Amino acid sequence: MSMQDPIADMLTRIRNGQSANKVAVTMPSSKLKLAIANVLKEEGYIEEFKIEGDTKPELELTLKYFQGKAVVESIQRVSRPGLRIYKRKDELPKVMAGLGIAVVSTSKGVMTDRAARQAGLGGEIICYVA
């Protein structure tokens, strides 16, 4: 059976991995998942990510902890296959009054809400991370 929402699966694997204090989580790889992982790494929510395997590439995310506590407090899917959520540049949300990030898919690639606002771009709100 095929997966209905691979991004929600990725976010759930991160959430479950951190609640179980796992060092790393693996999942099937895709271009969008790589772009989201890159944003999470740049913002300091994960240590690193790498791709393993040739025929079926797997994405491995090394999770990040601070003083034994998970860095990602909450990670929530916003736009989903059944209900896409798009926002203009002036409508982009601030997560936890600017302490968290919204991951946005724009015409110039996947970026944070802050970067999209600076670039003057709107797009699809993929998820909130705090």
Curated annotation (Swiss-Prot):
UniProt key word Metal-binding? no
InterPro entries in the record: Ribosomal_uS8, Ribosomal_uS8_CS, Ribosomal_uS8_sf
Q: Which GO terms describe its molecular function?
A: rRNA binding; structural constituent of ribosome
Task: Give GO terms for biological process.
Answer: translation
Q: What Gene3D superfamilies has UniProt attached to this entry?
A: 3.30.1370.30, 3.30.1490.10
Q: Name one GO cellular component term.
A: ribonucleoprotein complex
What Pfam families has UniProt attached to this entry? Ribosomal_S8
**Keyword set for this entry?**
Ribonucleoprotein, Ribosomal protein, RNA-binding, rRNA-binding
Q: Which residues cross the membrane?
A: none
- Give the domain of life: Bacteria
Please describe the quaternary structure of this protein.
Answer: Part of the 30S ribosomal subunit. Contacts proteins S5 and S12.
Q: Which family does it belong to?
A: Belongs to the universal ribosomal protein uS8 family.
- Briefly state the protein's biological role: One of the primary rRNA binding proteins, it binds directly to 16S rRNA central domain where it helps coordinate assembly of the platform of the 30S subunit.
> What is the protein name given in its UniProt record?
Small ribosomal subunit protein uS8
